[in-house]
Amino acid sequence: MDKKELFDTVINLEEQIGSLYRQLGDLKQHIGEMIEENHHLQLENKHLRKRLDDTTEQIEKFKADQKETKTQKAEQSDIGEGYDNLARLYQEGFHICNVHYGSVRKGDCLFCLSFLNKK
């Protein structure tokens, strides 16, 4: 191998090393961008999970409130029906108090009236 061939080989190796160095720099930059994107995606994922949890809690609370409201309405309608029946009996002239329940009433009874006013 003469000096010219040796010199050409060294120049060729230098060009290859330069090319590899540029490729390594590009790869390093690409990895940095991927790491940054991964970090942003992790933060976004964390925020979305928090929003999902908050929304799920709100939905569960809303459903529980609706169920409680239905239960209360059912109880109120039951209470209202019984109250109406007792008020009707009192208007028809019967006692509805625990002292004289069912007996014929002569005038107003304070016990019956206090029961009707409890509502």
From Swiss-Prot:
UniProt remark on cofactor binding: Binds 1 zinc ion per subunit.
A Pfam family annotated for this UniProt entry: YabA
Sites where the protein binds Zn(2+): 95, 97, 109, 112
InterPro entries the record matches: YabA
Superkingdom of source: Bacteria
Localization terms from the record: Cytoplasm, Nucleoid
Keyword list, A-Z: Cytoplasm, DNA replication, DNA replication inhibitor, Metal-binding, Zinc
Primary localization class, coarse: cytoplasm
Cofactors demanded by this protein: Zn(2+)
GO cellular component: nucleoid
GO biological process: DNA replication
Subunit structure: Homotetramer. Interacts with both DnaA and DnaN, acting as a bridge between these two proteins.
Family note: Belongs to the YabA family.
Purpose of the protein: Involved in control of chromosome replication initiation. Inhibits the cooperative binding of DnaA to the oriC region, thus negatively regulating initiation of chromosome replication. Inhibits the ability of DnaA-ATP to form a helix on DNA; does not disassemble preformed DnaA-DNA helices. Decreases the residence time of DnaA on the chromosome at its binding sites (oriC, replication forks and promoter-binding sites). Tethers DnaA to the replication machinery via the DNA polymerase beta sliding clamp subunit (dnaN).
Name of the protein in its database record: Replication initiation control protein YabA
Originating organism: Bacillus velezensis (strain DSM 23117 / BGSC 10A6 / LMG 26770 / FZB42)
